[in-house]
UniProtKB/Swiss-Prot annotation:
<dbReference type="GO" id="GO:0006412">
    <property type="term" value="P:translation"/>
</dbReference>
<keyword id="KW-0699">rRNA-binding</keyword>
<protein>
    <recommendedName>
        <fullName>Large ribosomal subunit protein uL18</fullName>
    </recommendedName>
</protein>
<comment type="similarity">
    <text>Belongs to the universal ribosomal protein uL18 family.</text>
</comment>
<keyword id="KW-0694">RNA-binding</keyword>
<dbReference type="InterPro" id="IPR005484">
    <property type="entry name" value="Ribosomal_uL18_bac/euk"/>
</dbReference>
<dbReference type="InterPro" id="IPR004389">
    <property type="entry name" value="Ribosomal_uL18_bac-type"/>
</dbReference>
<keyword id="KW-0687">Ribonucleoprotein</keyword>
<dbReference type="GO" id="GO:0008097">
    <property type="term" value="F:5S rRNA binding"/>
</dbReference>
<dbReference type="Pfam" id="PF00861">
    <property type="entry name" value="Ribosomal_L18p"/>
</dbReference>
<keyword id="KW-0597">Phosphoprotein</keyword>
<comment type="function">
    <text>This is one of the proteins that bind and probably mediate the attachment of the 5S RNA into the large ribosomal subunit, where it forms part of the central protuberance.</text>
</comment>
<dbReference type="GO" id="GO:0003735">
    <property type="term" value="F:structural constituent of ribosome"/>
</dbReference>
<comment type="subunit">
    <text>Part of the 50S ribosomal subunit; part of the 5S rRNA/L5/L18 subcomplex. In B.stearothermophilus only 2 proteins, L5 and L18 have been shown to be part of this subcomplex, unlike the case in E.coli and T.thermophilus where L25 (TL5) is also found.</text>
</comment>
<dbReference type="GO" id="GO:0022625">
    <property type="term" value="C:cytosolic large ribosomal subunit"/>
</dbReference>
<keyword id="KW-0689">Ribosomal protein</keyword>
């Protein structure tokens, strides 16, 4: 019997493989992206302290868009996380796409964060 491939399980395996190589430091923390069917989340994490420094998502009060699962929403989250990071003095990050393909909402978030001033 042929079993159907569980895309999320494959993504988690890919993310584990990527996380072995990507590590966020205090000088250059990790920008982690999580994408669900309805929302998108971004965190800037210092892996040496195991602490989230800055976060933004489509659930935030400052978000202000009606639709939360499209490219425009991802761009807004990218701008929010970059603005908050720059307020904390973070300019350079390591991008962690979370095992997702660099396409669509993930790419839109990354491009918006770059345009807002983050370097990666």
């Amino acid at each position: 019997m042929i079993t159907k491939v569980d895309r999320n399980a494959v993504r988690k395996k890919r993310h584990a493989r990527i996380r072995k190589k990507i590590f966020g430091t205090t000088e250059r923390p990790r920008l982690s992206v999580f994408r669900s069917n309805k929302h998108i989340y971004a965190q800037i994490i210092d892996d040496t302290k195991s602490a989230t420094i800055v976060s933004a998502s489509t659930l935030d009060k400052e978000f202000g868009l009606d639709s939360t699962n499209n490219i425009e929403a991802a761009k807004k989250v990218g701008e929010l996380v970059a603005k908050r990071a720059l307020e904390k003095g973070i300019k350079q990050v390591v991008f962690d796409r979370g095992g997702y393909l660099y396409h669509g909402r993930v790419k839109a978030l990354a491009d918006a964060a770059r345009e807002a001033g983050l370097e990666f």
